[in-house]
Regions:
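Adenine nucleotide phosphate-binding catalytic loops in nucleotide-utilizing enzymes
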Residues: 2-28, 82, 86-92, 100-171
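Phosphate-binding loop of NTP-binding sites
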Residues: 1-100
Length: 171
């Protein structure tokens, strides 16, 4: 999306046709292919800033090819364990792969001491400033509808829309 507008269907069709030989040759995953399309679309549209949410997360994520202005790590949980590891420390080590040389990183409040130390170490190795997000963002979810209503510091905001509607997006 750019300014809330979805990529138009014609662009998706043209991209699919143009990328067909690459798809046959490299057999990218669906996420890799849609990331590639999004990056091309953002470049074609000359966006000033793009907010990119990782899929797998970390070192192996297809979004990790970009050099961000800022990286954010909100939380660590047991997801994608077949790729990232079976302990929170192993998963944190993989997810720390998004920390880039001299690029600031924001660490979410839900990280425990052990995983947080993995990110501190990686940030120091990469000479990246790290910042700690405060625990209470003031955002609470009030209703679960297509256009959710959120309360931010006791002020209701209606029709605030997120493509994904989970607690991770609230963070």
């Amino acid at each position: 999306r750019i300014n809330g507008a979805m990529i138009d269907e014609d662009y998706v069709c043209r991209f699919t046709e143009e990328a067909q030989s690459l798809v046959e040759k490299y057999q990218p995953s669906f996420f890799e292919l849609t990331s590639m399309m999004a990056f091309k679309y953002f470049a074609d549209q000359q966006v000033d800033v793009a907010v990119i949410e990782v899929g797998l997360g970390g070192r192996l994520d297809s979004t990790n090819i970009i050099t961000p202005m800022l990286s954010v790590i909100t939380s660590i949980s047991f997801d994608h364990t077949q790729y990232l590891g079976t302990s929170l420390k192993e998963i944190a080590q993989e997810k720390a792969g998004i920390i880039k040389h001299k690029i600031p990183v924001v660490l979410g409040p839900g990280l425990d001491k052990d995983t947080r130390s993995v990110f501190y170490r990686k940030a120091e190795d990469m000479e990246a400033e790290y910042l700690e997000a405060e625990y209470n963002s003031g955002i609470t979810k009030l209703e679960r509808t297509p256009s959710m209503v959120y309360s931010i510091h006791h002020k209701d905001i209606k029709n605030l829309s997120f493509e994904l509607r989970g607690d991770a997006q609230k963070e």
